[in-house]
């Protein structure tokens, strides 16, 4: 089975990153190779979710390739309206499949090179999912607990939740593990049908309304 596993308080004076027009975001997202901007050494991402606000602080030196990919995806709106489609209590919550199947499809093979594991997969730490060497694309998970067993498998955290971990704990977990092992959404169908499938068959899933970068 594919090993896909699978943040409002800021310092005074924090500034929003420059806004990218929606049409430019869509065009950029259709060309993964064009989204190669280097991320700042440290930055924060605010998720306005259906349950409340979650803030993730990213430190580029933890996992440079992962931090750069996350920065570019957030800046260009990839995670807006994305569902938390896999929520396994005590383990992790996973997200990162775009709700538009056309966009999702162009990112499926846009893998980045692996980063060394410099941090442990502790509670609140944020990591890209992977299906093997150099296969990280867009899917991300937040650890509910201390999942140190993932460290030796190449799962390299690039950030951590600094505000709103209590919100993460409240994300709907009623569907459990995904199909075929559980009664949750099938990742293949999410890729093929997008949010239409999730809204129809898994309407209780929480989601990211808007993701923004804050310095």
Identify the function of each model-found stretch:
Residues 1-8, 15-18:
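Bacterial N-terminal signal peptides that target proteins for export
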Residues 13, 18-215:
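Cyclophilin-like peptidyl-prolyl cis-trans isomerases
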């Amino acid at each position: 089975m594919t090993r896909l596993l699978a943040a409002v308080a800021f310092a005074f004076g924090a500034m929003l990153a420059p806004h990218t027009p929606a049409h430019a975001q869509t065009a950029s997202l259709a060309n993964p190779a064009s989204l190669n901007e280097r991320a700042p050494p440290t930055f924060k991402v605010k998720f306005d979710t259906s349950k409340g606000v979650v803030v993730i602080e990213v430190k580029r030196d933890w996992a440079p390739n992962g931090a750069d990919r996350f920065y570019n995806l957030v800046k260009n709106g990839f995670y807006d309206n994305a569902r938390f489609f896999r929520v396994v209590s005590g383990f992790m919550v996973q997200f990162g499949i775009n709700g538009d199947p056309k966009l999702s499809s162009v990112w499926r093979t846009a893998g980045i090179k692996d980063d060394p594991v410099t941090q442990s997969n502790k509670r609140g730490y944020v990591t890209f999912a992977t299906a093997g060497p150099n296969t990280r694309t867009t899917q991300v998970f937040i650890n509910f607990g201390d999942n140190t067993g993932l460290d030796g498998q190449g799962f390299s955290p690039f950030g951590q939740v600094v505000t709103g971990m209590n919100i993460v704990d409240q994300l709907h977990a009623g569907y459990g593990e995904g199909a075929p092992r559980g009664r949750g959404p099938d990742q293949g169908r999410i890729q093929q049908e997008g949010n239409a499938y999730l809204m129809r068959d898994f309407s209780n899933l929480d989601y990211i309304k808007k993701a923004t970068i804050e310095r």
